[in-house]
C-alpha cells in the first residue's frame, strides 16, 4: 500500500511540475532595455503596424523584488534595484542573447519566457544568485522580512 501511495504522489508531483514547464520558442531579437530584475523589453519586428515594435518579456517561474513606488518597504526597493542591476550586467556581458517565448502573460501586454545568455538561463542565474524566488502564480512571499 505504501508503494502505491508513493508512486501516486510521485506521479502527481511530476504532472504538477510538467504543467509549470512550458515549451519555448527561441528567437534572437535584440534586447532594448531592462525594466526590472525579471522583465526585459526586446525588439518585436513581427508586430503589425501601428503597434509599437517592442514587447516585454517576464521571466517565467520567478519573482524578483519590486523597486521604486511598487516596493512595499525600503529593503524590497534595495533588493529590487540590485536584481535590476544584476540583470542589466548579465545582459551587457553576454555575447549571445536569446529570447525564449513560452506564452502570453495573463495581462496580455507582455510575454512569458526566459532570456538565454551565452547558453545560460537568466531565470536560473537570478535564483542561484539570490535575486529571485521561484514563483508560479501562488501568493507571493514578502521581500520585507
Language-model segments: residues:
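Sec-dependent N-terminal signal peptides
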Residues: 4-12
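Small beta-barrel nucleic-acid-binding modules, primarily SNase/OB-fold domains
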Residues: 16-145
Amino acid at each position: 500500500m505504501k508503494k502505491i501511495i508513493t508512486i501516486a504522489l510521485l506521479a502527481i508531483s511530476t504532472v504538477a511540475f510538467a504543467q509549470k514547464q512550458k515549451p519555448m520558442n527561441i528567437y534572437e531579437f535584440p534586447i532594448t532595455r531592462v525594466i526590472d530584475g525579471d522583465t526585459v523589453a526586446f525588439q518585436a519586428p513581427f508586430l503589425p503596424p501601428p503597434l509599437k515594435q517592442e514587447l516585454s518579456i517576464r521571466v517565467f517561474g520567478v519573482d524578483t523584488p519590486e523597486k521604486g513606488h511598487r516596493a512595499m518597504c525600503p529593503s524590497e526597493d534595495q533588493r529590487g534595484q540590485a536584481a535590476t542591476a544584476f540583470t542589466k550586467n548579465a545582459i551587457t556581458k553576454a555575447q549571445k542573447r536569446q529570447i525564449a517565448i513560452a506564452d502570453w502573460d495573463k495581462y496580455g501586454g507582455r510575454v512569458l519566457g526566459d532570456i538565454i545568455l551565452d547558453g545560460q538561463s537568466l531565470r536560473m542565474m537570478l535564483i542561484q544568485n539570490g535575486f529571485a524566488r521561484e514563483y508560479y502564480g501562488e501568493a507571493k512571499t514578502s521581500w520585507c522580512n
